[in-house]
C-alpha cells in the first residue's frame, strides 16, 4: 500500500486543508492518506481551539489515518518539529510527504535544504548563534536574503526536506503551492479559503463567516473554541511565582537565563498578552516565547524530551486507515501502534497525557486519553 | 519594658480576640502587647479571608505591635506551629505568652506538657507512630483519654508550654479561659461573641450578623472575603497534574507516599471540597490534608523549611509598639527587625513573599510585601 503523509495541525480543519489533502492524494498517486497532527497544543505556542479528538473527527473527512505528533514536536522550533514529524512518518512507513509551500518548486527548496545542512556545519553559523542572532536571521544572512526564506511555509518545507535527508533518505517529497498572503490574514475575505487565524477569530466572535470556508459536511462539528491562550495565564503566572529559578532553568527551550526575564516580567503582567509584550526582545520570536510559556504551563523539562519514536498514538481511522494499520502491524511486529491508551501503554505518551489533562483544566472539557475511544468513520 | 505576646491568626479579628487581648494586658501587668500573627495562609490550611495587611490594621485596634508568624509555622501541625511561634516570641524578647484554653488551669496544662515531653521519648510512642496512628490519637491513648486533651485550644496551649520548656525556659505563660463550644459553631447565636467560622460564613453570605461580634470602631475594615479556599483548587489541580511524583514527594509535610494518593484522587475531584472528601482517611486529619494542599499550592519544599528565626517581619505598630521596637534594636543590635521588605532584606522572607504573590493571584489583590508600607496607627 502506497501512502502519503501530511504534517498538520488542523486548528481547525478548513477548505485549505481539504484542498491540500485532495491534491496530495491525486499527485502522489497513493492509496492511503495519513495526517500526523499536533495534539492539544500547537506550534504557535497555544492550546488548540478544539481538543485533538474533535480535530481528529474533522480530519477524517479528508484523510484515512490520524496519528498524534508527539508533544515535544509541537512545542519545538521548525527543525525539531520537522525531525519528530519525519521520524513519525518513517515509523508509519510513509512513502511520500506532501507539504504546502509558497514556492511550490521542490527543486529550489531541495537545493536550499542541502545548502543549509552545509551552512549549519560552518564555523560562521555557530559564531552568529553565539552573538545572539536568531536562527531565521542567520539563515537569511548566510543565504544573502534568499526571498524563498521569507515565507513561513517554505522555511518549514525546507526543515522537512533537511530532516528527510538526515533521517529518512528513502522517503520522497511533494510540494503544493499555497498562498502565503493568506496565512496571517486577520479577516475572511475569500469565498472559499481563509487563514487559520481568521477562522479562529470568526469562531471566537460568533460571526458566521467561517461557514463559507470549512467543508459543508463537517460544519456541525464546529462550535465556540474550547479555550484560548488567555486561559493559560493564571497557571503560567502561578508557575513562575512558585517555582525556583533552577526548576525554570530545567524547562525545555528555556536557555540563556530566560528564566530570569520570565520571573521579572511576570510581576508586571496581568494577562497573557501583556506578558508577551513585556517579554518581547529582538533576540526571540513571538512563537519562541509562546512555546516557552507552554512548556512552563505543561512543566516539560529537558529530561522529558525524547526525539526518537518508540510508539505512535493513533487517534482515528477510516476503513482504509484500518487496513493500513493491519499492514503496518504485520510488517513491523515490534513497533507499537497504539489505538487505546491504558495503564500498559501510557508510559509511551506521558507528555501527551499530561497535555490533555492540562487542556481539560483550561477548557473544562473531560475527554482524556484514557476515556476516549479511537475515532472511527 | 515588659511585654505580653499573643499567638494569633485574626481571621478575622473579632470581639473574642479583643476580650483576650484586654484580659492578657490586665493580668500580665505588661506595658506592651505583641501579636505574632499568621500571614496570608492560616493553620486550618486555607488562605486567610483578608490579606495580612488588612488583618494587621484590625489587630492594631487591640495590640501595639504585629509581626508575621513565619509561613512554615502556619502550615505545620501544632508542635511546629508552637515551636516557631515561641522562637519568634523569644527573638522579640517577650516576657509572657498569653493563650486561650478551654481548661484555664495553667497548672494542669503545665503538668501535661511535662508529661508529654517524657511520653514522646518513650519507645511506645514511636511504635504507635509507625503503626500509622495520628499524633492526637496516640497522645490520648498514652494519657488514658485525659479530657483536657479533647479540646483544641488546650492541645495548642500544651504545645506552647512544651515549646517554652524546650526553647524559651525563661518565658512565662498565662492562660485565659475560652468557651470551647464556640470554636466550631457554624452560626452566630451570641450577642457579643462568635466563632471565626461563623463570622467568616456571615461575611461570605453578606448577612450582617458579624456586625454584632466585631469591635465597633473597626467595622469599616470588613468587607466580602478576599478569597476562599475553593479559589485554590484549579492551581492545586494544575500542580498535581504537571509535577512528577518526585517533586511532590519533596513538598513539605508530604510523607508515606501521600503524593500517590494525591495524584490518583485529583482526577476524581472537581472542587476543593470533593478533593478533600476523596483524600479523607482515618490516618490523617482534615487540617493535615488542607495544609498539605497549601504546601503544594505554594510549592513549599522540605528544603524551604527553617525552624530558626533569623529575622522578624514587622507588619504594623502603634506609637508604643514603635518605642518597643527601638528598645529591641538598642538591646539586640545584631537581630533583624524588618519594617520594610526590599531587595536587601527579601532573602529572609522568601516563603512569605511567595505566599503573598500567590494570595494576590487567588484574590486579585495587589498589595505585595514590597509595595505595602508598614501599617501605623
Swiss-Prot record, chains A, B:
An example Gene Ontology CC term for this record: cytoplasm
SUPFAM superfamilies tied to this protein: Nucleotidylyl transferase
Ligand binding (ATP): 7-20, 100, 153, 178
Keywords: ATP-binding, Cytoplasm, Ligase, Nucleotide-binding, RNA-binding, tRNA processing, tRNA-binding
Subcellular location: Cytoplasm
GO molecular function terms noted in the UniProt entry: ATP binding; ligase activity, forming carbon-nitrogen bonds; tRNA binding
Catalyzed reactions per annotation: cytidine(34) in elongator tRNA(Met) + acetate + ATP = N(4)-acetylcytidine(34) in elongator tRNA(Met) + AMP + diphosphate
EC number from the UniProt entry: 6.3.4.-
InterPro entries per record: Rossmann-like_a/b/a_fold, tRNA(Met)_cyd_acetate_ligase
Role this protein plays: Catalyzes the formation of N(4)-acetylcytidine (ac(4)C) at the wobble position of elongator tRNA(Met), using acetate and ATP as substrates. First activates an acetate ion to form acetyladenylate (Ac-AMP) and then transfers the acetyl group to tRNA to form ac(4)C34.
Family: Belongs to the TmcAL family.
The protein's name: tRNA(Met) cytidine acetate ligase
Amino acid at each position: 500500500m502506497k501512502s502519503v503523509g501530511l504534517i498538520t495541525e488542523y486548528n481547525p480543519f478548513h477548505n485549505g486543508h481539504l484542498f491540500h489533502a485532495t491534491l496530495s492524494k491525486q499527485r502522489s498517486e497513493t492509496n492511503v492518506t495519513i495526517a500526523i497532527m499536533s495534539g492539544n497544543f500547537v506550534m504557535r505556542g497555544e492550546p488548540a481551539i478544539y481538543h485533538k479528538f474533535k480535530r481528529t473527527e474533522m480530519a477524517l473527512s479528508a484523510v484515512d489515518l490520524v496519528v498524534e505528533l508527539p508533544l515535544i514536536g509541537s512545542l519545538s522550533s521548525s527543525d525539531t518539529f520537522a525531525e519528530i514529524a519525519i521520524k513519525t512518518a518513517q515509523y508509519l512507513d510513509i512513502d511520500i510527504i506532501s507539504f504546502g509551500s509558497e514556492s511550490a518548486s521542490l527543486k529550489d527548496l531541495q537545493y536550499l535544504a542541502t545548502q543549509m545542512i552545509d551552512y549549519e556545519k560552518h564555523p560562521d553559523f555557530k559564531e552568529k548563534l553565539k552573538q545572539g542572532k536568531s536562527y531565521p536571521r542567520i539563515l537569511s544572512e548566510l543565504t544573502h536574503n534568499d526571498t524563498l526564506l521569507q515565507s513561513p511555509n517554505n522555511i518549514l518545507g525546507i526543515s522537512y526536506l533537511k530532516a528527510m535527508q538526515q533521517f529518512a533518505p528513502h522517503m520522497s517529497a511533494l510540494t503544493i503551492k499555497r498562498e502565503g498572503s493568506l496565512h496571517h490574514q486577520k479577516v475572511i475575505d475569500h469565498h472559499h479559503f481563509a487563514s487559520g487565524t481568521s477562522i479562529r477569530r470568526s469562531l471566537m466572535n460568533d460571526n458566521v463567516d467561517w461557514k463559507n470556508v470549512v467543508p459543508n459536511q463537517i460544519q456541525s462539528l464546529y462550535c465556540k473554541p474550547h479555550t484560548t491562550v488567555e486561559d493559560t495565564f493564571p497557571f503560567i503566572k502561578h508557575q513562575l511565582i512558585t517555582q525556583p529559578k533552577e526548576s525554570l532553568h530545567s524547562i525545555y527551550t528555556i536557555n540563556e537565563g530566560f528564566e530570569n526575564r520570565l520571573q521579572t516580567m511576570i510581576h508586571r503582567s496581568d494577562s497573557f498578552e501583556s506578558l508577551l509584550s513585556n517579554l518581547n526582545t529582538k533576540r526571540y520570536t513571538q512563537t519562541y516565547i509562546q512555546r516557552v510559556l507552554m512548556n512552563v504551563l505543561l512543566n516539560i523539562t529537558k529530561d522529558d524530551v525524547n526525539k526518537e519514536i518508540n510508539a505512535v498514538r493513533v487517534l482515528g481511522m477510516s476503513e482504509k486507515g484500518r487496513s493500513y494499520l493491519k499492514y503496518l502491524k504485520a510488517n513491523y511486529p515490534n513497533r507499537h501502534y497504539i489505538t487505546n491508551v491504558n495503564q500498559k501503554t501510557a508510559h509511551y505518551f506521558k507528555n501527551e497525557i499530561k497535555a490533555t489533562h492540562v487542556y481539560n483544566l483550561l477548557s473544562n472539557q473531560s475527554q482524556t486519553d484514557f476515556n476516549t475511544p479511537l475515532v472511527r468513520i
